[in-house]
Amino acid sequence: MSASAGGSHQPSQSRAIPTRTVAISDAAQLPQDYCTTPGGTLFSTTPGGTRIIYDRKFLLDRRNSPMAQTPPCHLPNIPGVTSPGALIEDSKVEVNNLNNLNNHDRKHAVGDEAQFEMDI
């Protein structure tokens, strides 16, 4: 049977999560861990459950700041990703090698030779 002795069951009162909007004046005030909503709003949650919603205008202004334009330190050297100059040099060498191979193939092409033999 039921643990309640015939008493009526009342639903608990729901409460909204307390929120506050903070206008940030310095990028150092942003926490390391933050969340996003499906709409793209950034927010973080305090240990007490309060959501801190970050102002979109401030974040968009910070997009063009010198710190946002500076790559992180200690990145690995990945040609074409972290070092664009290396990719350009490598692609020039590769194009020259392909041109040399194509010229070499044209000089030695005698006829239509089969690539392999196959017994049928």
Swiss-Prot record:
Enriched in brain. A motif (YXXXXLphi motif) lies at residues 54-60. Keywords: Cytoplasm, Nucleus, Phosphoprotein, Protein synthesis inhibitor, Translation regulation. Signal peptide: none annotated. Disruption phenotype: Mice develop normally and are fertile. They however show defects in synaptic plasticity, impaired spatial learning and memory and conditioned fear-associative memory deficits. Mice show behavior defects and autistic-like phenotype, characterized by social interaction deficits, altered communication and repetitive/stereotyped behaviors: they show an increased ratio of excitatory to inhibitory synaptic inputs possibly due to increased translation of neuroligin family proteins. Mice lacking both Eif4ebp1 and Eif4ebp2 display increased their sensitivity to diet-induced obesity. One of its GO terms (molecular function) is eukaryotic initiation factor 4E binding. Changing T37A: Impaired hyperphosphorylation. The modification Phosphothreonine is found at T37, T46, T70. Repressor of translation initiation involved in synaptic plasticity, learning and memory formation. Regulates EIF4E activity by preventing its assembly into the eIF4F complex: hypophosphorylated form of EIF4EBP2 competes with EIF4G1/EIF4G3 and strongly binds to EIF4E, leading to repress translation. In contrast, hyperphosphorylated form dissociates from EIF4E, allowing interaction between EIF4G1/EIF4G3 and EIF4E, leading to initiation of translation. This is Eukaryotic translation initiation factor 4E-binding protein 2.
